[in-house]
Amino acid sequence: MTSMENITEVTEFILLGLTDDPNLQVPLLLIFLFIYLVTLIGNGGMMVIIFSDSHLHTPMYFFLSNLSFVDLGYSSAVAPKMVAALQSGNKVISYNGCAAQFFFFVGFATVECYLLASMAYDRHAAVCRPLHYTTTMTTGVCTILTIGSYTCGFLNASIHAADTFKLSFCGSNKINHFFCDIPPLLALACSSTHISKLVVFFVVGFNVFFTLLVIIISYFFIYIAIQNMKSSEGRKKAFSTCASHLTAVSIFYGTIIFMYLQPSSGQSMDTDKIASVFYTVVIPMLNPLIYSLRNREVKSALWKILNRFYPASFSVSRK
């Protein structure tokens, strides 16, 4: 029997998680369970608010509702398994389960890149061409941008999933991470990963820098338009409509670039884990807060919904 015949392909993986310290398992369980529940309530609530208030049926909120759905999607691809592993101690994930988690996480995360770019284009149209806004951001344009975002996202996920899971995993099946992400999976492969790493660098690089370029160009023209406004009130209003989006963009792209586009020799897996926690579970929780805390229209719509179900309590509390 040859040595090649003795090689056994991996049929399941073990997710090592954030830490193996038993004293930290319960605190981490409570923290991530809380974060995930806030994510579900925040993003689910944002979608309900937008769909239930006709005043929010505008391009900006159409994109925002899709962003909430996407945040739910890629957070749900990771958080439930992580919480279950912390609760039960069972860190095993099947090969197919790992591939599915990988596919949906990469897909939804890439969709978010393109949605953020679409939202920047929408803000550019609103600030730079307000008189033509309704003819620029039509229902058809918004639909095309959204469908294009999902298409690019899951096309990207298909490329990475096919490229990663064609590799041979015949050695250790212990993934030094809390979910099936690209870097730790490539580290486990027993076949050459040179081509796969090039695919990651160039495909992720294209998606990130193309969408980031759209955002930068949009905000360059937005900045010029704001500087040319004579009214300080107009400047303040224009800036406030963009501030939330800029905050979300900065946090999201900062962590994505740190994770996937720096030289592999310049990062440790533990550092990767910390960054991964941020963009897999923290950012989806923060986005609805970022977009709602300074948004009067969302707050007003929320009060209307609460007043509809609890008229006595909330009519008094608003006075």
From Swiss-Prot:
Signal peptide: none annotated. GO terms for cellular component: endoplasmic reticulum membrane; membrane; plasma membrane. GO terms for biological process: G protein-coupled receptor signaling pathway; sensory perception of smell. The chain crosses the membrane at residues 27-47, 56-76, 101-121, 135-155, 198-218, 239-259, 273-293. GO terms for molecular function: G protein-coupled receptor activity; olfactory receptor activity. It is found in: Cell membrane. It is a multi-pass membrane protein. Residues 48-55, 122-134, 219-238, 294-319 are cytoplasmic. Glycans are attached at residue 6. It comes from the Eukaryota. Keywords: Cell membrane, Disulfide bond, G-protein coupled receptor, Glycoprotein, Membrane, Olfaction, Receptor, Sensory transduction, Transducer, Transmembrane, Transmembrane helix. PROSITE patterns: G_PROTEIN_RECEP_F1_1, G_PROTEIN_RECEP_F1_2. Disulfide bonds join 98-190. Residues 1-26, 77-100, 156-197, 260-272 are extracellular. Belongs to the G-protein coupled receptor 1 family. Odorant receptor. This is Olfactory receptor 5B21. It comes from Mus musculus (Mouse). The lineage of its organism: Eukaryota, Metazoa, Chordata, Craniata, Vertebrata. The gene is Or5b21.
